[in-house]
From Swiss-Prot:
Region (Disordered) location: 783-802
Lineage: Viruses, Duplodnaviria, Heunggongvirae, Peploviricota, Herviviricetes
The protein's name: Uncharacterized protein U95
Protein source organism: Human herpesvirus 6B (strain Z29)
Domain of life: Viruses
Length: 1212
């Protein structure tokens, strides 16, 4: 900027009449020229003005400013804080917007009477900031002090009016207070002089503490004097003698990112007369040396502030090291490195003033508090206590490393998750189609009231284009009534540090009826849209779309809507998504009729009609119960002469209605395209745009989707169309065995030809078209396998089924199999073109904490007609009871079942085709010694071929003496091992019998266990080791329950009997999906219970097994809505942590496993199907009879086609 331009600028300002300065006419800004010339102005972190009516007694208008300065000009620009008073009543309708070159006043409509509103600037255009957009919303209500003696002169506060507004300024200029201290001339608590403020080691020097108040002349007129000061400054003086200086900040170099820090050399304090909810003091500094707060009314945020790097030319404030202190003495030292915490921006350069960072908001709005507490070292905390009686302030003094974030109590509660199940409430502005910022949760869910020492890691994930990814956590922020009585903690949306921005916070308008689904205490203020209702499960908006504010006698004014476009007008056809616990999501069944005539086309048609009815609803954003859908889709089906007997939907026992985890909290439809660069922000934007317009993604299923390369692990969903079969030589890797049992593979391969898993011209839309919301999962893949009978046959070319939410993504490897704090499996197969970032992968699994629970419940939808098993245990005996077994497509890893089965077939197939002679089998073992054979279950497990001599195995004679075995020879095939981690279980030996049986001998700890693994090698290819109880004790076997934080907590704390008894009380009522392992199809949900609270559960020690008293801690049902009286099996433990299953009808007690961890892998399958061969001394029948029973043992893992033929009426 040339000197002539600068001179002209200041001449224009100095020549302005005060009346013009406060008029409605805004002078055109020269900010465009400045930016075009490459001058980027350093922006102060936060400048806001609180303008309040002077007609109300004791109501004071105060404007506070704080500024940041570039690193090179610290001495030229000192951090300052000033106040502006003397605003007239007419100025209430003016919003002050200070441009880099001048002040601009623009009119706004006054707020409605009796309501609290907060406005702040919204700079839409990064080149030319828009002059006014009103953002944010309402306060939680006013705060009143119970102890008026806390005020300086012990004068009680006057009744404050409800009308409050906060106007924002674009702080391209530094405001500095000038002049002497003025006494308060308004009614209310008196102000505090500088001499009355005491500090610990550093006092407030004269001139540093300023307090100015509203001056009212006799005639009510206002006049201002503008004088010239040195250094390109101008001074605005009020009639009362107060003056403040505006100083132009030096610009940054052209195209340079702003990187500013505060001036830490000063401690600036500001106090004002009592204004309800306003802050009255500020301290900035890198190290606060025992700063005491003595008799300062209100709550004082103590912050160290630093702006953060951003891609935009302008910045807004970021805050860290924030402690909220009461007006009692508190000594604390804040030590921290200067790290950016948050800035507010989006890809279009829209900057939103968050408020409450350096200038605590006038109305204590919790959604305007963004602070990060890090490395807090508390000293002499006994002298003071951090207490809060106002909404929006968390009463926590963080000790050590911790995370303290204050966030958004929003109208929309769109939840996203981390890999541990933690949640964070995403501001609804995140759903703005034009907002390309996204949030990523990587930290633990932290409740500051209980876990003040919680540690949280924040990581940044970059996306292409202009978007930024942010870290966030879930915190609990206490809310209080005006009387000071606290609410129950409410999850808040918090902003955390990251190289990017935090999403914009947006609050409803007064015409918006807000209903939170949190169950809170206290009454509801109908006039306060942020008051919380009790036990409301959904959130609704009375006006549907963009909230409006009706001004008295004026046109409606759009407030704070995140969906405001570039022209400042809202998208009225955009409806906010509403959280719902009762909405059924669209389902998809990719179906290929194999000619088996089993009624599945009718199911698909019925579900399709149900989805069509959903799409025709007036507002698909609202949650709707299952019963409403049932009637509509049944009527639709009857009109089309379609039978839907397979569906059997009911409100009582259907898991889709009884399990809240199945519904999607935000109706999110994200169609994310897969590209080489990963998931782009534009794709997210497109998905959000579809969502905001109430559109559901409809995908046509045909064979024309372009081919995409996949790994063999991702080939479970491929089809045969347009794909040639390639022949290749099988890799039989030599295995080198170390002394510790680890496996070393050598590159030595045999010449056995196999079929490599085939690529496909049609890939599931999760791979070719993207992902859907993690909560909106369906059984598409399991149904595809079900429809194709487990083969790799594809969909008929002429058949097109438009899906009801196609997007079932079963990230099987991301189903945690270990009890680690984070998912560390680097082999997560997301199959939708999303690249890995370090040890974590961006996946739809993170969008909802109940994702894993939901997909386990949805996976068995194709088998719904067989779920209500009418089996009566009282009528049957023996090791094998006639139950409906669970298809492997429902298991953990079930979606990749065909991949492992294909590997098993190609691996064991050549062996099974050999003429079954002992000599040929022994020759095969010797020739392929140290090679491995893949098995069908569990995933990533093998049989490593070894001879008896090499293994040193000589237990066959012992087995013949102890167990009933078929006559004939027996040879060793090999030992069991895992693929990842590569290890050999030398105690598990696979045996081949002359009658073709496959047995597994487990001889760990001098104890011999023998299992009937399969009746022949072909069955062994499919069944694998699913029948063998000993395999479930290995950590390489996945848990059968969907892992989440609560499950991990229970498993970690159930390793001793005392902790198990304690946690059954603490986690009473917890329910988890339980159908991820082999077993009975109807055993789907496990309930943790305390027998003292459930009448249908036997009391402790009431049941004994072999003299051991049993203690019940859980029961298993078919549906989540079933009580304990409808339990299929009761689960108990003895004092040695042995797990037992108990059936009340017979009664029948079975020993299941040795510990809780194995139980969550194996389930209750042994209650019905026990493949362990007992010793001869324990046989209840003769050996020959028992061998006949084994010969007729049912298969445990049935392919979908075999399952239907076995259990359906058509197959009988």
């Amino acid at each position: 900027m040339s000197s002539n331009l600068e001179d002209l600028l200041w001449q224009q300002i100095l020549s302005m009449d005060p009346a013009e300065l406060l008029s409605d006419n805004a002078i055109s800004s020269t900010c465009d020229e400045n930016i075009a010339a490459g001058h980027h102005f350093t922006q102060s972190p936060h400048v806001e003005m609180s303008v309040q009516s002077t007609t109300s007694a004791g109501h004071t208008g105060v404007m506070t400013t704080q500024s940041q300065f570039s690193n090179g000009v610290r001495d030229q620009n000192r951090e300052s804080l000033s106040t502006l008073t003397g605003l007239s009543l007419e100025s209430i309708n003016n919003q002050i917007n200070v441009q880099p070159t001048q002040m601009t006043f623009q009119p706004i409509s006054p707020p409605m009477q009796g309501q609290n509103y907060v406005y702040s600037n919204n700079m839409i255009n990064p080149i030319k900031p828009r002059s006014i957009i009103k953002s944010h919303g309402h306060s939680m209500g006013e705060m009143s002090f119970a102890d008026h003696s806390l005020y300086v002169n012990a004068q009680p506060p006057v009744q404050q009016p409800q009308l409050k507004s906060l106007v924002g300024m674009h702080p391209c200029m530094t405001a500095t207070s000038q002049g002497k201290y003025q006494t308060n001339k308004t009614v209310g608590p008196p102000s505090i002089s500088a001499s009355q403020i005491t500090t610990g080691n550093a006092g407030i020097r004269p001139g540093e503490y300023q307090s100015v108040h509203n001056q009212s002349s006799v005639n009510g007129s206002k006049s201002y004097e503008i004088t010239t000061a040195s250094g390109d400054e101008w001074i605005l003086t009020t009639p009362g003698g107060q003056s403040w200086t505006l100083k132009r900040n030096p610009p940054n170099p052209p195209n340079n990112r702003t990187n500013s820090v505060v001036n830490k050399a000063q401690q600036v304090s500001h106090a004002q007369p009592y204004v309800s909810g306003s802050s009255d003091g500020f301290y900035q500094g890198a190290a606060l040396q025992s700063c005491a707060y003595v008799n300062t009314p209100g709550f004082t945020p103590v912050c160290e502030t630093q702006n953060m790097n951003n891609s935009q030319a302008t910045q807004l404030s970021a805050s860290m090291n924030c402690i909220n202190a009461l007006q009692t003495t508190m000594d604390a030292i804040v030590t921290s490195t200067s790290k950016p915490v948050g800035a507010v921006s989006n890809n279009r350069g829209a900057n939103f003033g968050m408020g409450g960072m350096e200038n605590y908001m006038d109305n204590n709005s919790p959604w305007n508090q963004y602070c990060k507490v890090q490395d807090i070292v508390s000293q002499n905390c006994s002298q003071g206590k951090v207490v809060s009686s106002t909404p929006g302030i968390a009463p926590n003094l963080m000790k050590g490393n911790g995370l303290n974030v204050y966030g958004h109590v929003g109208c929309v509660d769109a939840a996203i998750s981390d890999k541990q199940g933690g949640t964070a409430n995403v501001a609804s502005s995140l759903l703005n189609p034009e907002h390309q910022d996204w949030m990523r949760v990587t930290g633990t869910s932290t409740n500051l009231l209980n876990n003040i020492n919680a540690e949280t890691k924040m990581e940044n994930y970059g996306f292409p284009e202009n978007g930024n990814v942010h870290g966030a956590v879930n915190t609990a922020l206490p809310l209080t009534l005006s009387s000071g009585q606290p609410y129950t903690s409410v999850p808040q949306h918090g902003a955390c540090e990251g190289n990017g921005t935090i999403p914009v916070v947006q609050i409803c308008s007064p015409n918006t009826a807000f209903k939170a689904h949190y169950s809170l205490l206290g009454t509801v203020d109908e006039n306060n849209p942020l008051s919380v209702r009790e036990s409301i499960q959904d959130t609704s908006f009375s006006n549907g779309c963009a909230p409006q504010l009706s001004s008295p006698g004026g046109n409606p004014t759009i407030i704070a809507h995140s969906m405001i476009g570039n022209n400042g007008t809202p998208n009225k056809d955009v409806c906010k998504p509403t959280p719902s616990l009762r909405a059924i999501k669209k389902l998809n069944f990719d179906y290929d009729d194999r000619g088996e005539n089993i009624g599945f086309p009718s199911k698909l048609a019925a579900l399709l009609s149900m989805g069509e009815n959903m799409s025709k609803m007036d507002n698909p954003c609202y949650g709707t119960s299952l019963a409403q859908f049932e009637e509509s889709h049944q009527q639709n089906a009857s009109e089309g002469k379609i039978s839907i007997a397979d569906l059997e939907f009911s409100e009582e026992d259907d898991v889709l209605s009884s399990a809240a985890s199945v519904s999607c909290n935000d109706n999110c439809v994200m169609k994310i395209g897969a590209s080489q660069q990963g998931t782009t922000v534009a794709d997210l934007q497109q998905g959000f745009k579809q969502q905001m317009n109430g559109e559901f993604s409809m995908f046509a299923v045909d064979g024309n989707i372009k081919t995409q390369e996949m790994s063999n692990d991702c080939a479970s969903n491929v089809t045969d169309n347009a794909c040639a079969i390639r022949q290749n030589k099988r890799m039989h890797c030599e295995i080198g065995i170390s002394e510790d049992g680890r496996v070393r593979e050598e590159e030595k391969c045999s010449d056995v030809a196999i079929h490599v898993p085939r690529k496909s011209a049609r890939i599931h839309n999760m791979k070719s078209e993207g992902v859907t919301c993690g909560m909106c999962v369906t059984a598409a893949d399991s149904t595809r396998q079900d429809a194709s009978g487990g083969s790799s046959s594809g969909t008929k070319k002429g058949e097109k089924l438009q899906g009801l939410w196609k997007g079932y993504q079963d990230d099987d490897d991301s189903e945690l199999t270990e009890l680690s704090d984070t998912d560390s499996d680097n082999d997560v197969q997301n199959c939708h073109g999303v690249r890995k970032t370090g040890s974590k992968t961006y996946s739809s699994v993170f969008f909802n904490p109940d994702y894993r629970q939901a997909k386990r419940l949805l996976a068995d939808i194709p088998y719904r007609r067989w779920i209500p098993d009418t089996f009566n245990m009282e009528e049957h005996e023996g090791p094998f009871l006639p139950i409906v077994t669970r298809p492997p497509t429902v298991f953990m890893g079930g979606r990749r079942r065909r991949t492992y089965l294909r590997r098993s077939v190609t691996s064991i197939g050549p062996l099974s085709k050999l003429t079954y002679f002992k000599e040929l089998l022994q020759s095969y073992v010797l020739r392929n010694s140290n090679c491995y054979l893949s098995i069908g279950w569990p995933a990533k497990h093998r049989v490593y071929i070894m001879s008896e001599e090499k293994l040193g195995y000589n237990h066959i004679p012992t087995l013949r003496e102890m167990f009933p075995l078929p006559p004939g020879w027996m040879i060793v095939l090999g030992i069991v091992g895992s693929e990842t981690p590569a290890a050999l279980y030398k105690h598990m030996v696979v045996l081949l019998c002359e009658n073709k049986w496959v047995l597994l001998h487990n001889y760990r700890d001098s104890k011999h266990e023998l299992y009937f693994a399969a009746s022949d090698l072909k069955q062994f290819m499919e069944e694998g080791l699913s029948r063998c109880d000993c395999i479930y004790y290995e950590k390489s076997v996945p848990y059968g329950v969907a892992m989440e934080d609560s499950v991990r907590e229970f498993l970690r704390n159930s390793k001793t009997f005392q902790s198990l008894m304690e946690y059954r009380k603490n986690m009473h009522g917890s329910t988890w999906t339980f159908n991820g392992m082999p077993g009975r199809l109807g055993d789907r949900v496990i309930h943790i219970c305390n027998p003292e609270l459930v009448n249908s559960i036997p009391a402790d020690e009431a049941i004994r097994y072999e003299g051991k008293p049993l203690y019940f801690f859980a029961f298993v049902t078919t549906f989540k809505s079933h009580p304990g009286s409808k339990a299929n099996v009761l689960i108990a433990a003895d004092k040695n942590l042995g797990i037992y299953g108990y059936h009340k009808g017979r009664p029948r007690i079975r020993y299941l496993c040795k510990n809780v961890q194995a139980f969550f892998r194996a389930g209750v399958r042994k209650m019905y199907l026990d493949y362990e061969i007992p010793s001869k001394t324990l046989l209840a029948v003769s050996e020959d009879d028992y061998l006949c029973i084994l010969q007729k043992a049912p298969c445990l893992l049935l392919k979908p086609a075999v399952f239907r033929k076995t259990f359906s009426q058509e197959g009988k």
